[in-house]
């Protein structure tokens, strides 16, 4: 069994949301964005199903815990209790999983899909969970009597209840069989078989530790207690009793850790012990990461195929290397055991390792316009997007910045600058102003170079897809002015989110003595024994003499600012080709432009630690960004 789709209305921070699921689905985003609410919806639907009734009532007057009382109204979107919470799920069944249903429904092939709809309503002091609709679907021949009768009677009900048209497949029809309609069980026998088929198929893996009460010991912190729940410990105990499951567990652990501390006497499960370098140690004496990995893997292995696992933050207590290996092992287990994993994570490392990222889902809160209790308004609501579908921009950006894919899902602010030298120097200036900044340090911000990419696409991806606040700082040259226009056309406001520095390049602010020192160090490192020969060129010497006086850029009265580093880079390429063409290939320089990009970045890296003051115009830009975030 696999969940294909879940639809949620009016639940917690969710107004109206449809989520598609794959074999391995990963929900990733900031705290309080609604990830766990999506998991809870699945639990609310499935963990309350039973054969006795389609309705469950909770008398809120019986709740004594104040924290639970406080939660009641907040179950509804902005406490909007006049409208019921509506939850629905589409299921796909594995081959052979619904044989009993096929027989009792008279289908010619196995049951393929199911639709379940649940509502939660508030009525005086009652919270009512109600199973509204259950429909199953299977393929039969169009020419068969069953198909004709079913199609005639059920198409109207199907489209009315689900809003979906009946599908076709190679001449066959997907025929619905209504089990529950508007809270009424239509066929008790089929209903019982259906509930027996899907109950206990949803497994919530609790990775969070229980609070264990220790006996009254005068020396605090002396003894260890388990870092996982008693439920996970029992799962481990049951798993290691079975030899095949135990071997599978060990194989997975080797993939993650490289070695295995074996369980001792798996048939003696009162106390879990492991062998460690010839010693017998209790389970709780091993690291918390080891305990969590064992518990997660044992949960999946013990249940096996046809199950769906809901796992929150499997990366808890794990080293980044273990996180990446765990992600790969979980993905392999999902495929090998034919199970579905729905995972909540805060780890970009986890998603970076997945082979199939189509169902990595970014979860965030956005402002939405709705008609709320009779008047139009804007409210924050949980929204989702699929960052690894379509454009691969974020992945290539992550590689260039040396961060893992998914990094941007945790960013609040993106400051777009032209190149890497701008990124490095701007960060240095922000660090110098840190005591004056009230807002920017509170945000997860990232400075991103946009040269060599479509600025329009970058702004769209970060602003619309990721929901990140975007700023642009452009150079004061022809290209910079073009980029300012693009940003303004994309809805960014000049002097609020779009800024232009006074110079043609950020390196133009560097003192000439600091700039020439860094440039000379870099040229000596790169050119080695070719240094003296190259710098004998008269034109190169002339440009360097100007750099000693003016720095990277030269201002001439009545003329445009002259970019001296750009001029030097072009001449260096020409001279180096004449001196030693093979040598220039080894440096990876294929043009004057490539030399310029390299020199800019490396000079910025050398200079940033020597910065002592911030130019006035850049200081004003940074303070304006800080104010805009207030």
Swiss-Prot record:
Keywords from the named record: Plasmid
Keyword Glycosyltransferase listed: no
The UniProt record lists the keyword Amino-acid biosynthesis: no
SUPFAM superfamilies linked to this entry: P-loop containing nucleoside triphosphate hydrolases
Occurrences of domain Toprim (ranges): 412-507
Pfam families named in the record: AAA_15, OLD-like_TOPRIM
Protein name: Uncharacterized protein MJECL35
UniProt organism field: Methanocaldococcus jannaschii (strain ATCC 43067 / DSM 2661 / JAL-1 / JCM 10045 / NBRC 100440)
């Amino acid at each position: 069994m696999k969940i294909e789709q879940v639809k949620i209305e009016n639940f917690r921070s969710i107004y109206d949301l449809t989520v598609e699921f794959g074999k391995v689905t990963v929900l990733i985003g900031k705290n309080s964005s609604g990830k766990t609410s999506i998991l809870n919806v699945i639990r609310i639907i499935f963990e309350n199903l039973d054969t006795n009734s389609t309705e469950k009532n909770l008398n809120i007057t019986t709740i004594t815990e104040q924290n639970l009382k406080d939660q009641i109204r907040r179950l509804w979107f902005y406490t909007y209790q006049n409208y019921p919470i509506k939850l629905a799920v589409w299921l796909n069944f594995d081959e052979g999983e619904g044989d009993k249903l096929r027989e009792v429904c008279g289908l010619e092939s196995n049951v393929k899909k199911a639709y379940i709809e649940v509502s939660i309503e508030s009525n005086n002091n009652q919270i009512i969970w109600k199973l509204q609709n259950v429909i199953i679907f299977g393929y039969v021949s169009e020419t068969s009597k069953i198909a004709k009768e079913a199609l005639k009677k059920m198409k109207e009900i199907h489209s009315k209840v689900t809003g979906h048209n009946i599908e076709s497949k190679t001449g066959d029809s997907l025929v619905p069989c209504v089990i529950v309609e508007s809270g009424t069980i239509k066929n008790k026998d089929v209903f019982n078989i259906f509930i027996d088929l899907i109950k206990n198929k949803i497994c919530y893996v609790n990775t969070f530790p229980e609070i264990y009460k220790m006996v009254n010991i005068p020396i605090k912190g002396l003894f260890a207690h388990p870092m996982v729940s008693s439920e996970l410990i029992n799962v481990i105990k049951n798993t290691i009793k079975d030899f095949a499951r135990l071997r599978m567990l060990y194989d997975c652990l080797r993939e993650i850790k490289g070695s295995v501390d074996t369980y001792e006497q798996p048939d003696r499960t009162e106390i879990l012990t492991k062998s460690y370098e010839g010693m017998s140690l209790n389970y709780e004496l091993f690291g918390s990461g080891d305990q969590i990995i064992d518990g997660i893997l044992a949960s999946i292995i013990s249940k096996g195929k046809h199950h769906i696992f809901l796992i929150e933050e499997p990366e808890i207590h794990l080293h980044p290397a273990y996180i990446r290996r765990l992600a790969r092992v979980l993905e392999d287990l999902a495929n090998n055991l034919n199970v579905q994993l729905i995972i909540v994570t805060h780890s970009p490392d986890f998603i970076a390792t997945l082979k199939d990222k189509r169902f990595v889902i970014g979860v965030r809160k956005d402002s939405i316009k709705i008609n709320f209790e009779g008047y139009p308004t804007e409210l924050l609501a949980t929204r989702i997007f699929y960052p690894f579908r379509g454009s691969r921009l974020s992945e290539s950006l992550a590689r260039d910045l040396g961060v893992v894919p998914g990094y941007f899902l945790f960013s609040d602010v993106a400051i777009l600058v032209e190149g890497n030298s701008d990124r490095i120097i701007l960060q240095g200036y922000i660090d110098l102003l840190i005591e004056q900044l009230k807002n920017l340090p509170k945000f997860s911000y990232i400075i991103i170079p946009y040269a060599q990419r479509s600025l329009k696409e970058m702004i769209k991806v970060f602003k619309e897809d990721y929901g990140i606040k975007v700023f642009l700082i452009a150079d004061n040259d022809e290209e910079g002015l073009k980029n300012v226009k693009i940003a303004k056309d994309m809805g960014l406001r000049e002097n609020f989110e779009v800024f232009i520095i006074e110079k043609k390049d950020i390196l133009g602010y560097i003192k000439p003595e600091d700039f020439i020192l860094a440039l000379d160090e870099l040229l000596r490192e790169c050119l080695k024994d070719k240094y003296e020969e190259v710098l004998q060129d008269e034109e190169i010497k002339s440009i360097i003499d100007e750099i000693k006086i003016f720095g990277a850029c030269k201002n001439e009265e009545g003329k445009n600012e002259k970019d001296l580093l750009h001029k030097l880079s072009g001449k260096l390429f020409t001279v180096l080709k004449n001196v030693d063409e093979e040598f220039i290939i080894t440096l990876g320089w294929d043009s004057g432009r490539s030399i310029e990009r390299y020199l800019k970045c490396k000079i910025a890296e050398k200079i940033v630690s020597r910065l002592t003051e911030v130019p006035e115009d850049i200081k004003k830009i940074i303070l304006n960004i800080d104010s805009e975030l207030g």
